[in-house]
C-alpha cells in the first residue's frame, strides 16, 4: 500500500464554505474546511475553522457518523448540549461523541473563533447532519 502524500495549506488560502443554509442551522457563520477528503484525501478526518460574528450561531445538530471536538480559541457564548445550553469561553475544549446534540451561539459582542474537527468522516456528507424536527426543543438545563 502506497501512503498518500502529506497535505499542507494556509488558512488564508482556504475559501469560506459556500451553500451552508440558515434553514439548516448555519446562521451567519464563516466556515472553512481546512483538511478533509476534498482537499487532502483524508477519508476519516475533517479539520475546520469557524468565525462567528456577534449574533451568529450553529444551531443544535448532530452527526450520526463521526465524533467532534471543538476548541474555543477566542470569544465567548453558549454551547448547545443534549440537555440545554451552557456558557462557553476562550480555552474551552469540548468533545461530542457521534449521535449527540451540540452547537454554538455567539451571545457576546465580539467574534468567536473556533477550531474543530471530526473523527470518522472526511466530509459533511459522510459525517451526516441532522437538525431537530420543528417543535422538538429541549428544556433549558
Enumerate the predicted regions with their spans.
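A short beta-strand-loop-beta hairpin characteristic of the jelly-roll/cupin
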Residues: 57, 63-90, 100
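A short, N-terminal "cap"/entry segment at the start of jelly-roll beta-barrel domains
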Residues: 1-44, 59, 129-141
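Short strand-connecting beta-turns/loops that link adjacent beta-strands
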Residues: 39-40, 65, 109-110
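Cofactor-binding loop segments of dinucleotide-utilizing enzymes, especially the Rossmann-like FAD-
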Residues: 36, 74, 119
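Intrinsic-disorder/low-complexity, polar/charged segments enriched in Ser/Thr/Lys/Arg/Asp/Glu/Gln
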Residues: 45-47, 57, 76, 113
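Ligand-binding loop in jelly-roll beta-barrel domains
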Residues: 78, 85, 89-90, 98-124
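Conserved hydrophobic/aromatic beta-strand scaffold that supports enzyme active sites
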Residues: 31-33, 47-51, 69, 85, ...
Amino acid at each position: 500500500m502506497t501512503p498518500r502524500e502529506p497535505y499542507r495549506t494556509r488558512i488564508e488560502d482556504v475559501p469560506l464554505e459556500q451553500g451552508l443554509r440558515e434553514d439548516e442551522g448555519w446562521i451567519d457563520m464563516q466556515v472553512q474546511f481546512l483538511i478533509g477528503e476534498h482537499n487532502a484525501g483524508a477519508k476519516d478526518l475533517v479539520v475546520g475553522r469557524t468565525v462567528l460574528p456577534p449574533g451568529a450561531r450553529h444551531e443544535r445538530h448532530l452527526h450520526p457518523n463521526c465524533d467532534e471536538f471543538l476548541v474555543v480559541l477566542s470569544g465567548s457564548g453558549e454551547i448547545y448540549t443534549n440537555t440545554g445550553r451552557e456558557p462557553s469561553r476562550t480555552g474551552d475544549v469540548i468533545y461530542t461523541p457521534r449521535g449527540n446534540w451540540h452547537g454554538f451561539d455567539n451571545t457576546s459582542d465580539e467574534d468567536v473563533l473556533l477550531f474543530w474537527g471530526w473523527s470518522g468522516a472526511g466530509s459533511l456528507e459522510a459525517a451526516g447532519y441532522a437538525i431537530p424536527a420543528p417543535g422538538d426543543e429541549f428544556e433549558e438545563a
